Amino acid sequence: MIPANSTIRSLFLEGPAGRLESLLNAGSEKATHAAVVCHPHPLFGGTLHNKVVFHAMKALNSFGFPVLRFNFRGTGLSQGEHDHGIGEVEDVRTALDWLKSEFHLPLIFARFSFGAAVGLRAACADPQVRATIALGVPIAPVAADTEEPRVYSFEFLESCDKAKLFVSGARDQFGPRAKLEALVASIPDPKKLVVIEGADHFFEGRLREMREAIEAWVKEAVGSQPSVLGRL
């Protein structure tokens, strides 16, 4: 069993738009992977402290993996301005590059909502990323009367051959089940879709089930076992 490490390190990464506020949950000396988790849309309150992001971090950290969370540009103490999902892709690359140089381990890339939309492309193109986890994929168009109307494209997934986990709520208002099932069916293996009954986009009241889905899949895809302490 891998002992848990409860150390949390606060740091700033040097990104193309300035410093990115970050938190690193330390891993075990026997860690086999390192991971990053991206937060949801900053214009709608998304930060690295989001509940879904936190529980995804805890799931990955329970395996002894060091896990990085960061605020996208213009969010929290991160410098720069929100760039409508364009410059944020470079923020993801900054986080991935930092993890590579810091740990020299294969990477797992996890993200929620907006983080999934902007980060998947960077993760699929990075040879050191071995597995990806998408939570609450915003596959439905964002309403035109919102502050940032947008339709996200996931066509690049058709050439992404990394291990892929999708976790969605059956009542996700931004990721209709039929559309998500069609997307997953169109992309190459290895892949897995877990739909949590009764859950909405934010997994309200279903965070434990979401976390358990991540842990079960990591055991399958990576072959690691979570620490009992890491589940606290």
Task: Identify the role of each PLM range.
Residues 1-30:
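N-terminal cap/lid segment of alpha/beta-hydrolase-fold proteins
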Residues 28-69:
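Short, surface-exposed "cap/lid" segments of acyl-processing enzymes
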Residues 52, 82-102, 121:
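Alpha/beta-hydrolase active-site loop
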Residues 111-119:
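Gly/Ala-rich beta-loop-alpha elbow adjacent to hydrolase catalytic centers
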Residues 141, 170-175, 201-202:
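Acidic catalytic loop of the alpha/beta-hydrolase fold
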Residues 159-161, 166-168, 172:
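Short beta-strand/loop motif that positions the catalytic acidic residue
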Residues 186-202:
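Catalytic histidine neighborhood in serine/cysteine hydrolases
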Residues 199-211:
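Catalytic histidine-centered segment of alpha/beta-hydrolase-like enzymes
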